[in-house]
Protein backbone atom coordinates (compact mmCIF):
# COMPACT_ATOMS: atom_id res chain seq x y z
CA UNK A 1 0.00 0.00 0.00
CA UNK A 2 1.18 3.49 -0.80
CA UNK A 3 1.46 6.32 1.72
CA UNK A 4 -1.61 8.09 0.33
CA UNK A 5 -3.74 4.94 0.65
CA UNK A 6 -2.64 4.50 4.29
CA UNK A 7 -3.48 8.14 5.09
CA UNK A 8 -6.88 7.77 3.39
CA UNK A 9 -7.54 4.55 5.29
CA UNK A 10 -6.62 6.25 8.58
CA UNK A 11 -9.00 9.11 7.91
CA UNK A 12 -11.84 6.64 7.21
CA UNK A 13 -11.15 4.84 10.48
CA UNK A 14 -11.11 8.14 12.39
CA UNK A 15 -14.47 9.13 10.93
CA UNK A 16 -15.92 5.68 11.78
CA UNK A 17 -14.65 6.04 15.37
CA UNK A 18 -16.27 9.47 15.67
CA UNK A 19 -19.56 8.07 14.32
CA UNK A 20 -19.43 5.16 16.77
CA UNK A 21 -18.62 7.47 19.70
CA UNK A 22 -21.57 9.68 18.84
CA UNK A 23 -23.75 6.53 18.57
CA UNK A 24 -22.54 5.31 21.97
CA UNK A 25 -23.24 8.73 23.43
CA UNK A 26 -26.76 8.73 21.95
CA UNK A 27 -27.51 5.23 23.26
CA UNK A 28 -26.16 6.22 26.69
CA UNK A 29 -28.47 9.25 26.75
CA UNK A 30 -31.42 7.05 25.69
CA UNK A 31 -30.56 4.49 28.39
CA UNK A 32 -30.42 7.20 31.03
CA UNK A 33 -33.74 8.59 29.81
CA UNK A 34 -35.27 5.10 29.98
CA UNK A 35 -33.93 4.63 33.51
CA UNK A 36 -35.41 7.96 34.55
CA UNK A 37 -38.74 6.97 32.99
CA UNK A 38 -38.70 3.57 34.74
CA UNK A 39 -37.93 5.27 38.03
CA UNK A 40 -40.72 7.76 37.47
CA UNK A 41 -43.20 4.99 36.57
CA UNK A 42 -42.11 2.95 39.60
CA UNK A 43 -42.81 5.95 41.80
CA UNK A 44 -46.22 6.36 40.17
CA UNK A 45 -47.02 2.66 40.72
CA UNK A 46 -45.89 2.97 44.31
CA UNK A 47 -48.15 5.97 44.82
CA UNK A 48 -51.07 4.23 43.10
CA UNK A 49 -50.65 1.07 45.18
CA UNK A 50 -50.95 2.90 48.47
CA UNK A 51 -53.81 1.64 50.59
CA UNK A 52 -56.75 1.85 50.88
CA UNK A 53 -57.97 0.06 47.73
CA UNK A 54 -61.47 0.25 46.36
CA UNK A 55 -62.94 -3.27 46.54
CA UNK A 56 -64.52 -4.46 43.29
CA UNK A 57 -65.86 -7.61 41.66
CA UNK A 58 -64.86 -8.78 38.19
CA UNK A 59 -68.11 -9.03 36.21
CA UNK A 60 -66.79 -10.08 32.80
CA UNK A 61 -63.52 -10.50 30.88
CA UNK A 62 -63.48 -9.50 27.19
CA UNK A 63 -61.06 -10.06 24.31
CA UNK A 64 -60.78 -6.78 22.38
CA UNK A 65 -59.08 -6.39 19.00
CA UNK A 66 -58.39 -2.69 18.18
CA UNK A 67 -58.49 -3.42 14.43
CA UNK A 68 -62.23 -4.02 14.72
CA UNK A 69 -62.77 -0.44 15.89
CA UNK A 70 -62.83 2.17 13.14
CA UNK A 71 -62.98 5.78 14.17
CA UNK A 72 -62.94 8.41 11.45
CA UNK A 73 -61.30 11.67 12.45
CA UNK A 74 -61.40 10.95 16.16
CA UNK A 75 -58.53 11.08 18.60
CA UNK A 76 -57.30 7.53 19.21
CA UNK A 77 -56.40 6.60 22.76
CA UNK A 78 -53.19 4.59 22.97
CA UNK A 79 -54.61 2.41 25.74
CA UNK A 80 -57.57 1.42 23.60
CA UNK A 81 -55.18 0.31 20.83
CA UNK A 82 -53.63 -2.38 23.01
CA UNK A 83 -54.74 -5.84 21.96
CA UNK A 84 -55.64 -8.25 24.75
CA UNK A 85 -58.07 -8.79 27.58
CA UNK A 86 -60.26 -6.08 29.01
CA UNK A 87 -62.40 -6.24 32.11
CA UNK A 88 -65.78 -5.07 33.34
CA UNK A 89 -65.78 -4.46 37.10
CA UNK A 90 -68.40 -3.45 39.64
CA UNK A 91 -67.15 -1.46 42.61
CA UNK A 92 -68.43 -1.49 46.17
CA UNK A 93 -70.06 1.87 45.41
CA UNK A 94 -72.36 0.00 42.95
CA UNK A 95 -70.77 1.58 39.85
CA UNK A 96 -69.78 -0.47 36.80
CA UNK A 97 -66.64 0.35 34.77
CA UNK A 98 -65.05 -0.97 31.60
CA UNK A 99 -61.25 -1.20 31.83
CA UNK A 100 -59.37 -1.33 28.49
CA UNK A 101 -56.18 -1.80 30.53
CA UNK A 102 -56.63 -4.24 33.38
CA UNK A 103 -53.70 -3.11 35.51
CA UNK A 104 -50.93 -4.80 37.44
CA UNK A 105 -52.57 -8.24 37.64
CA UNK A 106 -52.10 -10.86 34.92
CA UNK A 107 -55.34 -11.03 32.95
CA UNK A 108 -55.02 -14.80 32.51
CA UNK A 109 -55.25 -15.28 36.28
CA UNK A 110 -58.54 -13.39 36.59
CA UNK A 111 -61.97 -14.96 36.26
CA UNK A 112 -65.51 -13.59 36.65
CA UNK A 113 -66.53 -13.29 40.28
CA UNK A 114 -63.02 -12.61 41.60
CA UNK A 115 -62.60 -9.98 44.30
CA UNK A 116 -59.98 -7.35 43.37
CA UNK A 117 -58.55 -4.15 44.80
CA UNK A 118 -58.55 -1.17 42.39
CA UNK A 119 -57.18 2.35 42.55
CA UNK A 120 -59.86 4.75 43.72
CA UNK A 121 -59.00 7.31 41.02
CA UNK A 122 -57.90 5.39 37.91
CA UNK A 123 -59.77 2.11 38.72
CA UNK A 124 -56.78 0.05 37.57
CA UNK A 125 -56.68 -3.40 39.16
CA UNK A 126 -53.76 -3.45 41.58
CA UNK A 127 -54.16 -6.73 43.45
CA UNK A 128 -56.40 -9.79 43.71
CA UNK A 129 -58.06 -10.20 47.10
CA UNK A 130 -58.98 -13.45 48.90
CA UNK A 131 -62.54 -14.70 48.54
CA UNK A 132 -64.94 -13.02 50.94
CA UNK A 133 -66.98 -15.24 53.26
CA UNK A 134 -69.52 -14.33 55.89
CA UNK A 135 -67.83 -13.98 59.28
CA UNK A 136 -70.50 -16.23 60.78
CA UNK A 137 -69.52 -19.01 58.35
CA UNK A 138 -65.84 -18.67 59.24
CA UNK A 139 -66.80 -19.03 62.89
CA UNK A 140 -68.47 -22.36 62.03
CA UNK A 141 -65.13 -23.90 61.08
CA UNK A 142 -63.81 -26.01 63.94
CA UNK A 143 -60.16 -24.99 64.35
CA UNK A 144 -59.25 -27.63 66.91
CA UNK A 145 -59.61 -31.16 65.58
CA UNK A 146 -62.02 -33.27 67.67
CA UNK A 147 -60.26 -35.80 69.91
CA UNK A 148 -63.07 -38.37 70.15
CA UNK A 149 -62.38 -41.90 68.90
CA UNK A 150 -64.63 -44.77 67.94
CA UNK A 151 -63.51 -46.57 71.10
CA UNK A 152 -65.19 -43.78 73.12
CA UNK A 153 -68.60 -44.80 71.73
CA UNK A 154 -70.41 -47.81 73.14
CA UNK A 155 -73.19 -49.90 71.59
CA UNK A 156 -73.12 -48.24 68.14
CA UNK A 157 -70.92 -50.66 66.18
CA UNK A 158 -73.38 -50.98 63.27
CA UNK A 159 -73.85 -47.21 63.03
CA UNK A 160 -70.08 -46.64 63.12
CA UNK A 161 -69.61 -49.11 60.26
CA UNK A 162 -72.28 -47.42 58.12
CA UNK A 163 -70.84 -43.95 58.73
CA UNK A 164 -67.30 -45.11 57.91
CA UNK A 165 -68.50 -46.63 54.62
CA UNK A 166 -70.35 -43.45 53.61
CA UNK A 167 -67.94 -40.72 54.78
CA UNK A 168 -64.46 -41.97 55.72
CA UNK A 169 -63.84 -44.54 52.96
CA UNK A 170 -64.64 -42.17 50.02
CA UNK A 171 -62.19 -39.62 51.49
CA UNK A 172 -59.32 -41.91 52.47
CA UNK A 173 -59.69 -44.65 49.81
CA UNK A 174 -61.22 -42.96 46.79
CA UNK A 175 -59.61 -45.46 44.41
CA UNK A 176 -61.71 -48.37 45.77
CA UNK A 177 -64.91 -46.69 44.58
CA UNK A 178 -63.34 -45.83 41.20
CA UNK A 179 -62.21 -49.43 40.67
CA UNK A 180 -65.75 -50.70 41.30
CA UNK A 181 -67.27 -47.88 39.26
CA UNK A 182 -69.71 -46.80 41.98
CA UNK A 183 -70.50 -43.33 43.29
CA UNK A 184 -70.15 -42.79 47.03
CA UNK A 185 -73.07 -41.25 48.96
CA UNK A 186 -73.24 -37.46 49.06
CA UNK A 187 -74.44 -37.26 52.62
CA UNK A 188 -75.67 -39.05 55.71
CA UNK A 189 -78.77 -38.41 57.82
CA UNK A 190 -78.52 -39.55 61.44
CA UNK A 191 -81.81 -39.70 63.31
CA UNK A 192 -82.93 -40.97 66.68
CA UNK A 193 -84.00 -39.87 70.16
CA UNK A 194 -81.94 -37.22 72.00
CA UNK A 195 -78.84 -38.42 73.83
CA UNK A 196 -78.14 -41.46 71.65
CA UNK A 197 -74.73 -40.29 70.37
CA UNK A 198 -75.40 -38.64 67.00
CA UNK A 199 -73.19 -35.58 67.55
CA UNK A 200 -70.54 -37.67 69.32
CA UNK A 201 -70.26 -40.02 66.34
CA UNK A 202 -69.99 -37.08 63.92
CA UNK A 203 -67.10 -35.64 65.96
CA UNK A 204 -65.37 -39.03 66.04
CA UNK A 205 -65.76 -39.31 62.26
CA UNK A 206 -64.17 -35.86 61.78
CA UNK A 207 -61.29 -36.87 64.06
CA UNK A 208 -60.55 -40.00 61.98
CA UNK A 209 -60.31 -38.07 58.69
CA UNK A 210 -57.89 -35.23 57.98
CA UNK A 211 -60.80 -33.10 56.85
CA UNK A 212 -61.92 -29.59 57.65
CA UNK A 213 -64.93 -29.81 59.96
CA UNK A 214 -67.70 -27.19 59.60
CA UNK A 215 -70.37 -27.37 62.30
CA UNK A 216 -73.66 -25.68 61.44
CA UNK A 217 -76.64 -25.61 63.77
CA UNK A 218 -80.07 -25.51 62.16
CA UNK A 219 -81.28 -22.52 64.25
CA UNK A 220 -78.20 -20.52 63.11
CA UNK A 221 -79.50 -20.67 59.54
CA UNK A 222 -82.81 -19.03 60.49
CA UNK A 223 -82.10 -15.33 60.05
CA UNK A 224 -84.25 -12.22 60.29
CA UNK A 225 -83.45 -10.66 56.91
CA UNK A 226 -84.66 -12.13 53.63
CA UNK A 227 -81.98 -14.19 51.89
CA UNK A 228 -79.58 -14.09 54.83
CA UNK A 229 -80.02 -17.76 55.75
CA UNK A 230 -79.63 -18.88 52.13
CA UNK A 231 -76.42 -16.82 51.84
CA UNK A 232 -75.04 -18.56 54.94
CA UNK A 233 -75.70 -21.95 53.33
CA UNK A 234 -74.02 -20.86 50.07
CA UNK A 235 -70.98 -19.46 51.87
CA UNK A 236 -70.66 -22.60 54.01
CA UNK A 237 -70.56 -24.86 50.95
CA UNK A 238 -68.15 -22.49 49.12
CA UNK A 239 -65.80 -22.52 52.12
CA UNK A 240 -66.06 -26.32 52.29
CA UNK A 241 -65.14 -26.63 48.59
CA UNK A 242 -62.15 -24.32 49.01
CA UNK A 243 -60.88 -26.24 52.05
CA UNK A 244 -61.66 -29.73 50.69
CA UNK A 245 -61.55 -32.44 51.88
CA UNK A 246 -64.16 -31.24 54.34
CA UNK A 247 -67.19 -32.39 56.31
CA UNK A 248 -70.25 -30.19 56.88
CA UNK A 249 -72.17 -31.24 59.98
CA UNK A 250 -75.69 -29.77 60.23
CA UNK A 251 -77.13 -30.37 63.69
CA UNK A 252 -80.85 -30.00 64.43
CA UNK A 253 -81.78 -30.20 60.74
CA UNK A 254 -85.50 -30.07 61.60
CA UNK A 255 -85.12 -26.33 62.37
CA UNK A 256 -84.99 -25.58 58.63
CA UNK A 257 -85.95 -28.89 56.99
CA UNK A 258 -89.58 -29.28 58.04
CA UNK A 259 -92.28 -30.03 55.49
CA UNK A 260 -93.34 -27.14 53.28
CA UNK A 261 -96.83 -25.72 53.67
CA UNK A 262 -98.78 -22.65 52.58
CA UNK A 263 -98.17 -19.83 55.03
CA UNK A 264 -98.78 -16.11 55.02
CA UNK A 265 -96.00 -15.45 57.52
CA UNK A 266 -92.75 -14.05 56.14
CA UNK A 267 -90.72 -16.02 58.69
CA UNK A 268 -92.05 -19.37 57.46
CA UNK A 269 -91.33 -18.45 53.84
CA UNK A 270 -87.78 -17.43 54.76
CA UNK A 271 -87.17 -20.81 56.45
CA UNK A 272 -88.44 -22.55 53.31
CA UNK A 273 -86.12 -20.46 51.13
CA UNK A 274 -83.18 -21.52 53.32
CA UNK A 275 -84.15 -25.18 52.89
CA UNK A 276 -84.46 -24.76 49.11
CA UNK A 277 -80.93 -23.33 49.02
CA UNK A 278 -79.73 -26.36 51.00
CA UNK A 279 -81.42 -28.67 48.46
CA UNK A 280 -79.77 -26.74 45.64
CA UNK A 281 -76.32 -27.07 47.23
CA UNK A 282 -76.81 -30.80 47.86
CA UNK A 283 -77.63 -31.26 44.17
CA UNK A 284 -74.98 -28.79 43.01
CA UNK A 285 -71.70 -30.43 43.93
CA UNK A 286 -70.46 -33.69 42.41
CA UNK A 287 -70.38 -36.82 44.59
CA UNK A 288 -66.73 -37.35 43.64
CA UNK A 289 -65.67 -34.11 45.30
CA UNK A 290 -64.21 -34.24 48.77
CA UNK A 291 -67.16 -32.51 50.44
CA UNK A 292 -69.47 -34.63 52.59
CA UNK A 293 -72.59 -33.65 54.52
CA UNK A 294 -73.68 -35.18 57.83
CA UNK A 295 -77.08 -34.09 59.15
CA UNK A 296 -78.59 -34.99 62.52
CA UNK A 297 -82.15 -34.71 63.81
CA UNK A 298 -84.43 -36.28 66.39
CA UNK A 299 -87.62 -35.46 64.44
CA UNK A 300 -87.24 -37.32 61.15
CA UNK A 301 -91.04 -37.53 60.84
CA UNK A 302 -91.41 -33.79 60.14
CA UNK A 303 -88.60 -33.50 57.54
CA UNK A 304 -89.48 -32.57 53.97
CA UNK A 305 -89.53 -35.59 51.60
CA UNK A 306 -87.28 -33.69 49.16
CA UNK A 307 -84.47 -33.83 51.73
CA UNK A 308 -84.85 -37.56 52.26
CA UNK A 309 -84.83 -38.71 48.66
CA UNK A 310 -81.88 -40.65 47.27
CA UNK A 311 -79.20 -38.49 45.69
CA UNK A 312 -79.17 -35.93 48.51
CA UNK A 313 -78.86 -37.58 51.91
CA UNK A 314 -78.38 -41.12 50.58
CA UNK A 315 -77.44 -42.98 53.75
CA UNK A 316 -79.94 -42.87 56.61
CA UNK A 317 -78.65 -44.18 59.95
CA UNK A 318 -81.02 -44.82 62.85
CA UNK A 319 -79.78 -44.36 66.42
CA UNK A 320 -82.08 -46.40 68.70
CA UNK A 321 -82.16 -46.33 72.49
CA UNK A 322 -79.25 -48.46 73.80
CA UNK A 323 -80.04 -52.03 74.85
CA UNK A 324 -78.78 -53.66 78.05
CA UNK A 325 -75.40 -54.65 76.59
CA UNK A 326 -74.89 -51.17 75.10
CA UNK A 327 -75.73 -49.46 78.41
CA UNK A 328 -73.18 -51.62 80.24
CA UNK A 329 -70.55 -50.76 77.61
CA UNK A 330 -71.32 -47.02 77.84
CA UNK A 331 -70.91 -47.01 81.62
CA UNK A 332 -67.66 -48.96 81.32
CA UNK A 333 -66.31 -46.39 78.83
CA UNK A 334 -67.16 -43.43 81.07
CA UNK A 335 -65.80 -45.17 84.18
CA UNK A 336 -62.46 -46.29 82.77
CA UNK A 337 -60.66 -43.13 83.94
CA UNK A 338 -62.26 -43.28 87.38
CA UNK A 339 -60.94 -45.10 90.43
CA UNK A 340 -63.61 -47.83 90.52
CA UNK A 341 -63.88 -50.72 92.97
CA UNK A 342 -63.56 -54.19 91.37
CA UNK A 343 -66.93 -55.29 92.82
CA UNK A 344 -68.89 -52.97 90.49
CA UNK A 345 -71.20 -55.11 88.32
CA UNK A 346 -71.95 -53.20 85.11
CA UNK A 347 -74.41 -55.84 83.86
CA UNK A 348 -76.57 -55.39 86.96
CA UNK A 349 -76.34 -51.60 86.58
CA UNK A 350 -77.45 -51.93 82.95
CA UNK A 351 -80.50 -53.94 84.02
CA UNK A 352 -81.40 -51.19 86.50
CA UNK A 353 -81.16 -48.43 83.86
CA UNK A 354 -84.02 -49.47 81.63
CA UNK A 355 -85.11 -46.76 79.12
CA UNK A 356 -81.93 -44.73 79.75
CA UNK A 357 -80.20 -43.17 76.75
CA UNK A 358 -76.44 -42.81 76.36
CA UNK A 359 -76.32 -39.32 77.88
CA UNK A 360 -78.19 -40.52 80.98
CA UNK A 361 -75.81 -43.49 81.35
CA UNK A 362 -72.95 -41.00 81.38
CA UNK A 363 -74.85 -38.90 83.93
CA UNK A 364 -75.08 -41.98 86.20
CA UNK A 365 -71.26 -42.24 86.22
CA UNK A 366 -70.91 -38.52 87.00
CA UNK A 367 -73.49 -38.69 89.82
CA UNK A 368 -71.78 -41.77 91.28
CA UNK A 369 -68.47 -39.87 91.35
CA UNK A 370 -70.09 -36.89 93.09
CA UNK A 371 -71.71 -39.19 95.68
CA UNK A 372 -68.35 -40.85 96.40
CA UNK A 373 -66.73 -37.41 96.66
CA UNK A 374 -69.44 -36.29 99.08
CA UNK A 375 -68.70 -39.12 101.52
CA UNK A 376 -64.91 -38.70 101.19
CA UNK A 377 -64.21 -42.06 99.53
CA UNK A 378 -61.13 -42.82 97.43
CA UNK A 379 -62.92 -45.17 95.01
CA UNK A 380 -66.39 -45.68 93.59
CA UNK A 381 -68.43 -48.65 94.82
CA UNK A 382 -71.44 -50.46 93.39
CA UNK A 383 -73.71 -48.69 95.89
CA UNK A 384 -72.50 -45.30 94.59
CA UNK A 385 -73.63 -46.27 91.09
CA UNK A 386 -77.02 -47.45 92.40
CA UNK A 387 -77.53 -44.13 94.19
CA UNK A 388 -76.47 -42.34 91.00
CA UNK A 389 -79.15 -44.26 89.08
CA UNK A 390 -81.76 -43.13 91.62
CA UNK A 391 -80.59 -39.52 91.27
CA UNK A 392 -80.86 -39.59 87.46
CA UNK A 393 -84.23 -41.37 87.62
CA UNK A 394 -85.56 -38.71 90.02
CA UNK A 395 -84.44 -35.94 87.64
CA UNK A 396 -85.96 -37.81 84.72
CA UNK A 397 -89.35 -38.16 86.46
CA UNK A 398 -89.26 -34.53 87.60
CA UNK A 399 -88.62 -33.41 84.02
CA UNK A 400 -91.46 -35.56 82.72
CA UNK A 401 -93.87 -34.18 85.31
CA UNK A 402 -92.71 -30.64 84.61
CA UNK A 403 -93.26 -30.92 80.87
CA UNK A 404 -96.55 -32.74 81.40
UniProtKB/Swiss-Prot annotation:
Cellular-component GO terms for this entry: cytoplasm; nucleus; proteasome accessory complex; proteasome regulatory particle, base subcomplex
Alphabetical GO biological process terms: proteasome-mediated ubiquitin-dependent protein catabolic process
SMART domains associated with the record: AAA
Keyword ATP-binding attached: yes
One Pfam family it belongs to: Prot_ATP_ID_OB_C
Record's function text: The 26S proteasome is involved in the ATP-dependent degradation of ubiquitinated proteins. The regulatory (or ATPase) complex confers ATP dependency and substrate specificity to the 26S complex.
GO MF: ATP binding; ATP hydrolysis activity; proteasome-activating activity
Recorded superkingdom: Eukaryota
Keyword annotations from UniProtKB, A to Z: ATP-binding, Cytoplasm, Nucleotide-binding, Nucleus, Proteasome
Official protein name in the record: 26S proteasome regulatory subunit 6A-B
Family: Belongs to the AAA ATPase family.
Xref: PROSITE patterns: AAA (PS00674)
Places the protein is found: Cytoplasm; Nucleus
Subunit structure: May form a heterodimer with a related family member.
Organism (species): Xenopus laevis
Highest classification ranks of the organism: Eukaryota, Metazoa, Chordata, Craniata, Vertebrata
Binding, ATP: 192-199
